């Protein structure tokens, strides 16, 4: 075995590509490394097409092995299970830029498998996997119009940083991944701390320029190690069949695409499609239904795109920059902590915000380390939202991806834990869908959070944009419909506040989209976002001053860290009894910060008072009320503040001589005692004699407790 190796510098890192030694039965296999983070990527492509195949069956699997980080998986079976949310998102990140680079009409099955086999905690495996997939596809000989490069762009101290480390990323105001060929950007996925449109576009251009190093390196690698390119020729169009479909359907489809209501339009289009299939198959029984449908779909695209380029009204009658009618309701669910319904045309999201305590945080165990997530965002897309029946179950890749995009849009305005000590979960239920449900989720989430009283820094809105380009002419569409989404050449989603962008996702299907075109599109998206924010601000101008009556209120207090063990008690007995008896939950940080969550404020104040008693210092000369806990021949033990026990010697029980302790005291009896002495070992000596005017200490919980709501 003589492996072929290509090594090159990429920014501050060294990238190594190796092939020829492992997985030689795969169509292509590449071991891609970047500073000890290594991803093994294989490509298997079938030479034959399944009979009746009418779509491109590309599958991308991304899997992380725990041995890559020197760990053994948890759980009973001690092996990796189903893909995590993070793995699913990275699989989508690999898929999106490579899919448009396969030629139209190529229907051979291809599977890309990326396996993380070694990980440097400072280098995220996602970029390495994208570079490895690009290299493997380029070597494989399949008709892939790559290679692509991939870059991560950070923004630190007002400077763009190429492929920042995990430590650097914590200081960055931007996390942007861009992928593309030597000529064009194909995919952008980003999260930003409210940057301007100009800064976002500059980051995209910067990343695309820098990744040319990768594109050139893979081309050189392929010259040395690549397999012969497949002798694949695109199938010739069946002009006779195309003309037949046009003759039957063109005029009728033109009329159907003037119906503004989605369901009525779809019914009409389905009827036309069924009629076309019936007429053509009646004339020619051997005519393929799949090919007829493909031609019919292409005709739909041609009609809609032609009208847009010609400047005619869109499918629903709007101009290119008009946003659909908006309708907003907040506080729609009486017992939830915050809720809103956001409707834009025929797209509708029911967003619900729930407040929880720190123990509700999600613990995420990644290869690069364990972390806690205090802001959860879940997106559900049930089949009824598009008038269909279907399976209801665990979230699919699309739902996970849309939920993450919506979360990115809102994350920048969320308060820190110090400002608002709650774990927050937002769920977006898509109840209607006709384009851009993920951006409706951003708007709905912003409204629900404000309804819940979460002090977000600003309202956030999202908008989905499209672009249609024919030669030198192009048209940017604001607030695209579902039909416009898949017929366009670029679709991108922008979320942000009035001040700037918080998330940008872009998928480009053709070459020739220049930075100038992107700038025009981003500016048009900004105008649409401002319009939506204006309507949202009318519905709820600021976060509610108070949280819901049904949400837990979190009260904080400070204790001496040395006293934490006293509050917890032996085996957790003290803290357990406090929570069980009062119905509260208590979290204690190492610095002595105590957080008490309770729906009932009286219960919280009760707990705080009891904690103050537990941690209170016993002072010599002060009289306390205590309870007799046990009797001995030589005296009685009495528990005073914080269940601290002291001894009342038999000689200190009464003024007269005491023969038998039980003649004077019983277990459980409440008595007043004075602290005589606390010795070096912390033992407390008490007396019941000479109790001058009572000086019982009173602990004022109100003075030392700060309520945070």
UniProtKB/Swiss-Prot annotation:
Mg(2+) binds at residues 485, 491. Keywords: Cytoplasm, Magnesium, Metal-binding, Nucleotidyltransferase, RNA-binding, Transferase. Coiled coil: none annotated. GO terms for biological process: mRNA catabolic process; RNA catabolic process; RNA processing. One of its GO terms (cellular component) is cytosol. It comes from the Bacteria. It is found in: Cytoplasm. Pfam families: KH_1, PNPase, RNase_PH, RNase_PH_C, S1. Residues 621-689 form the S1 motif domain. The keyword Iron does not apply. The keyword Transferase applies. GO terms for molecular function: 3'-5'-RNA exonuclease activity; magnesium ion binding; polyribonucleotide nucleotidyltransferase activity; RNA binding. Residues 552-622 form the KH domain. Its EC number is 2.7.7.8. Involved in mRNA degradation. Catalyzes the phosphorolysis of single-stranded polyribonucleotides processively in the 3'- to 5'-direction. Belongs to the polyribonucleotide nucleotidyltransferase family. This is Polyribonucleotide nucleotidyltransferase. The lineage of its organism: Bacteria, Pseudomonadati, Pseudomonadota, Gammaproteobacteria, Pasteurellales. The gene is pnp.
């Amino acid at each position: 075995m003589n492996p072929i190796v290509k090594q090159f510098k990429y920014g501050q890192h060294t990238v190594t590509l190796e092939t020829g030694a492992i997985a030689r039965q795969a169509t292509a296999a590449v071991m891609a490394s970047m500073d000890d983070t290594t991803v093994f990527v294989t490509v298997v492509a079938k030479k034959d097409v399944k009979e009746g195949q009418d779509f491109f069956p590309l599958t991308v699997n991304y899997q992380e092995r725990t041995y890559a980080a020197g760990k053994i998986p948890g759980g009973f079976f001690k092996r990796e299970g189903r893909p995590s949310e993070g793995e699913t998102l990275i699989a989508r990140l690999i898929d999106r830029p490579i899919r448009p680079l396969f030629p139209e009409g190529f229907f051979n099955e291809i599977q890309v498998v990326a396996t993380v086999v070694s990980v440097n905690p400072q280098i995220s495996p996602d970029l390495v996997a994208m570079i490895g997939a690009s290299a493997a596809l380029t070597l494989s000989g399949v008709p892939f119009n790559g290679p692509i490069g991939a870059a991560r762009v950070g923004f630190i101290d007002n400077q763009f940083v190429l492929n920042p480390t995990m430590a650097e990323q914590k200081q960055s105001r931007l996390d942007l991944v861009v992928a593309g060929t030597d000529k064009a950007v194909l995919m952008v996925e980003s999260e930003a701390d409210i940057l301007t449109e100009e800064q976002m576009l500059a980051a995209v251009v910067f990343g695309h320029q820098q990744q040319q190093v990768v594109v050139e390196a893979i081309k050189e690698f392929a010259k040395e190690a690549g397999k012969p390119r497949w002798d694949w020729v695109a199938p010739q169009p069946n002009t006779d069949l195309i003309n037949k479909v046009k003759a039957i359907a063109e005029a009728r489809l033109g009329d159907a695409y003037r119906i503004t209501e989605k369901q009525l339009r779809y019914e009409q289009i389905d009827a036309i499609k069924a009629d076309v299939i019936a007429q053509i198959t009646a004339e020619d029984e051997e005519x393929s239904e799949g090919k007829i449908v493909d031609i019919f779909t292409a005709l739909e695209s041609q009609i809609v795109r032609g009208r847009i380029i010609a400047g005619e009204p869109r499918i629903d009658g709007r101009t290119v920059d008009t946003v659909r009618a908006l309708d907003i309701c907040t506080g729609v669910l009486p017992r939830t902590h915050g809720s809103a319904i956001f409707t834009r045309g025929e797209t509708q999201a029911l967003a619900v915000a729930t407040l929880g305590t720190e123990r509700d945080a999600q613990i995420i165990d990644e290869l690069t380390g364990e972390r806690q997530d205090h802001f959860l965002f879940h997106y559900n897309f049930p089949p009824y939202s598009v008038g269909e029946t279907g399976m209801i179950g665990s979230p699919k890749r699309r739902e996970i991806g849309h939920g993450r995009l919506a979360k990115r849009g809102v994350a920048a305005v969320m308060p820190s834990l110090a400002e608002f000590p709650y774990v927050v979960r937002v769920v977006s239920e898509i109840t209607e869908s006709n384009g851009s449900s993920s951006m409706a989720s951003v708007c709905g989430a912003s409204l629900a959070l404000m309804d819940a009283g979460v002090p977000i820094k600003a309202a956030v809105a999202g908008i989905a944009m499209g672009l249609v380009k024919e030669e030198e002419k192009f048209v940017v569409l604001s607030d695209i419909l579902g039909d416009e989404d898949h017929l366009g050449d670029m679709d991108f989603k922008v979320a942000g506040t009035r001040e700037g962008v918080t998330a940008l996702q872009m998928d480009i299907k053709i070459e020739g989209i220049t930075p100038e075109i992107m700038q025009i599109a981003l500016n048009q998206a900004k105008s649409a976002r401002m319009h939506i924010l204006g309507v949202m601000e009318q519905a709820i101008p600021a976060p509610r001053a108070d949280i819901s009556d049904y949400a837990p209120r979190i009260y904080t207090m400070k204790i001496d860290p040395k006293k934490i063990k006293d509050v917890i008690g032996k085996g957790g007995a003290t803290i357990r009894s406090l929570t069980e008896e009062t119905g509260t939950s208590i979290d204690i940080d190492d610095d002595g910060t105590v957080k008490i969550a309770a729906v009932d404020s009286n219960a919280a104040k009760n707990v705080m008072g009891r904690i103050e008693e537990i941690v209170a210092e016993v002072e010599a000369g002060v009289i306390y009320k205590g309870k007799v806990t046990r009797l001995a021949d030589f005296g009685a033990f009495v528990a005073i503040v914080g269940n601290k026990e002291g001894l009342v010697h038999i000689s200190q029980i009464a003024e007269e001589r005491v023969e038998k302790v039980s003649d004077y005291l019983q277990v459980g009896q409440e008595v007043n005692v004075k602290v005589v002495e606390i010795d070096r070992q912390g033992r407390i000596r008490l007396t019941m004699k000479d109790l001058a005017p009572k000086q019982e200490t009173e602990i004022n919980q109100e003075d030392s407790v700060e309520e945070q709501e």
